[in-house]
Each structure stands twice: as C-alpha cells, then as structure tokens.
C-alpha cells in the first residue's frame, strides 16, 4: 500500500516546493519563453529594431544546407558518443565489479573525469592531440598515422568524440557498477553450477537485468551529446575544420554571438528544446515498457 504524507494545512506542501518551483520558473521557463518569442522575430545586428516574422526563421533554418549538415554531424556524433561511452563504461564496470585487489583505487580513478569541467577536458585532449607537441599525436606518427585534426575533418570528429566519451565515462560507470552490484549473486552462482561460462552468464542474466539502466543511460548520453558538449567542441576544434564539427549546440552559439543572427539562433535553440522534451518523454513513458527483465 502506498503511504502518503498528511499535512494539517493545505498550503504547506506548496510552500515547501515553492523555492524549487521558483528556480525552475526563473532558470527554465522564463528563458525558454524568451527563446520562443525571439525565434519569431528578426532583429538587426545592433539590436535597435525588432520585427515579427512568424515562422520565417524556422523555414530559413531548415532550408539552410549548413544547418542540415550540422544536424547530420550531430546525429553521427551523438551515436558515437552514446555507443562508445556506454560500451566502454559497461566493460569497466564489469572489471570493477570483479576486481578485489586495488578496487578502491580503480573505482576512484574512474570517477575522476566527472570532476573535470568540460572546457578543461577539451583543453587536456587538444594538448594531447596537438599536431606539434601532443603526446598522442607523436605516438600516432610513430605508427605511421599522420595526425592533424586542424586539417582533417575525420580526425577532428574523432577528437571531440574521444574527449566527450572520456568526460561522460564516470557517470555511466557509476550507474552500471551500481546495477551490477544490485544483481543477486545467487543467480550468477546457479548459472555457474549449470556450467554457464562468463559470457553466457553475462548475456543471459546480467545484461537483461541491466536493461533499465542501459536504456536510461542511452537517453542521458544522447541528451549529453546534444546539449552538454559545447565547451568540449569550443576548446578542441571550434567547429572546424571549416564547419565539419559544428554540432547543433555549437551552431546556436556561433550564429547568435558570431554571426549576430539572434532570431535564427533562437529558432535553433527552440528546435533543440523540442528534441530534449521528446527524449524526456521517451525516457519516462517507455523505460518501464521497453526494457527486458
């Protein structure tokens, strides 16, 4: 039976949640409403005049080949970040769940990237992959790979994917490790008695029980790749070479603060907001229905 808290005063629950509601109103709903209004306006570069243009900014946006290309780059980037990040984190969590000696150091070491700011993470990786002084680029040259992400768009995309995956790996690792440790050991021991090997035990017992965690992390990682990687891209490639790594969130900033197209930039932010709302709905409505136990 579900228990509910009873309050003598009907206004007390509302009073308790009022501070949080105020934060949400000021820092989410107000900026979101401002972006929607601004996306339907055209403003000159000096901000002296504003005119209502309706949906013209959205029409111009989807007719722009650069925006369509940015959408494609973002889709590829998101798939790579989510796929590689989840797979690598799961492998590391499996090792952490089994390791005995040095377990505390191993787990602490894997949590460190989460404490690093995205901009700092981008700077660290751009130094390591620097064509002139980078340790990693030097090692790649020793292997016969001519690394220069400033000129090669494929290498630039690889760089931002690696940096983004490294930054998010701690978050994924913690959830997978918690999920693995919550699985009853008796199930695994029974499977071992039935001569099931490690791989079979993982794919028939552990991975199906981790499906809620995996689905949750899939949505979170896609949202992360779409919205929380601006600092990494800005610190590593600045959307280059050309605009080959200009993901959507970076293009919002570039068009708004560099090109001074405030209406177009606001329209792009509204599109991004619609994407995150859609992903959130998928997460909360289907996470219970689509997972396999």
Kindly label every feature range from the protein language model.
Residues 5-293:
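A structural signal for multi-pass alpha-helical bundles of membrane permease subunits
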């Amino acid at each position: 039976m579900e228990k509910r808290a009873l309050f003598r005063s009907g206004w007390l629950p509302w009073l308790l949640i009022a501070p949080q509601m105020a934060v949400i109103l000021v820092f989410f709903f107000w900026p979101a409403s401002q972006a929607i209004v601004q996306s339907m306006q055209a403003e000159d570069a000096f901000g002296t005049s504003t005119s209502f243009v309706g949906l013209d900014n959205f029409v111009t946006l989807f007719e722009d080949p650069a925006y369509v290309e940015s959408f494609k780059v973002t889709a590829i980037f998101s798939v790579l970040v989510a796929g590689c990040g989840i797979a690598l984190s799961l492998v590391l969590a499996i090792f952490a769940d089994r390791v005995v000696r040095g377990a505390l150091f191993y787990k602490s070491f894997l949590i460190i990237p989460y404490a690093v700011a995205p901009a700092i993470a981008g700077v660290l990786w751009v130094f390591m992959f620097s064509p002139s002084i980078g340790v990693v680029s030097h090692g790649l040259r020793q292997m016969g790979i001519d690394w220069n992400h400033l000129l090669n768009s494929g290498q630039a995309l690889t760089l931002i994917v690696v940096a983004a995956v490294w930054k998010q790996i701690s978050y994924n690792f913690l959830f997978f490790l918690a999920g693995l440790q919550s699985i009853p050991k008796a199930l695994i021991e029974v499977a071992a008695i039935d001569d099931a090997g490690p791989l079979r035990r993982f794919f028939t017992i552990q991975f199906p029980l981790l499906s809620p965690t995996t689905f949750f992390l899939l949505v979170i990682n896609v949202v992360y790749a779409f919205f929380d990687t601006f600092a990494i891209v800005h610190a590593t490639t600045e959307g280059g070479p050309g605009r080959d790594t200009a993901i959507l969130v970076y293009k919002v900033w570039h068009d708004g603060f560099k090109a001074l197209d405030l209406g177009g930039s606001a329209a792009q932010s509204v599109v991004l907001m619609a994407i995150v709302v859609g992903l959130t709905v998928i997460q909360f409505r289907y996470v219970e229905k689509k997972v396999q136990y």
